[in-house]
Amino acid sequence: STMTPFPHYQYTESFAKERDALDPLADFRSRFHFPKINGKDALYFCGNSLGLQPKTAASYLEKELAAWATMGVDGYFHGEDPWYSVRKKSKPILAQILGALPEEVVAMNYLSVNLHLLMVSFYQPTPTRFKIIVEGGAFPSDQYMLETQIKFHGLDPNDVLVELLPRTGEFTLRTEDIVEEIRKQGSSLAMVNMAGIQYYTGQLFDIQAITQAAHEVGAVAGFDLAHAAGNAPLHLHDWDVDFATW
């Protein structure tokens, strides 16, 4: 999908403030702590690395620390929010955000750990089907993970990874170019492993089209949704995505 630009777009401070005033989510700004620079709230554009702290975060942490202090190990099964049941309570919430069924999601571990676990299950290279398509400039942790998993199978990342780059003079990938590369790799392609949103350019990929193209050549499609979950509409179940983490 493409966004229609404002017909009267202006590169001016007054126009930016006008759009901010009309933003239905503008009030959410007041719910976060901002670092101060020269006594003023910083203009914060590092959410892709570490988001701003919600003002409610400290109270939630204090609540659980108090439960730990007063109940110790009994906190797993007793109290207002027993820790053991947290994962079950989170399932329907996560499922709604991801467009998945509750039985298809679980809250566990850390992003890179989950990527490794998913690769162990879904990356099963053969002598003829072993290639992995990834967007060029992927998040560094994802690159390290892929190289580690490829070497685990005794393969050379230079022989396995197919990095997608924008056309000359462009900054984002065209969906038709991604699909074309998938079809080009064909029976040698084992997996498409991409982000949902490219952390550096902010490009939202067409997950459905990419997944469909991968399946058409017999490959699996998985996505790192660290920057997409809760940030863009997702319908992972309907799109038939093989695996994802965030």
Where are these regions (language model features)?
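Pyridoxal 5′-phosphate
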Residues: 2-246
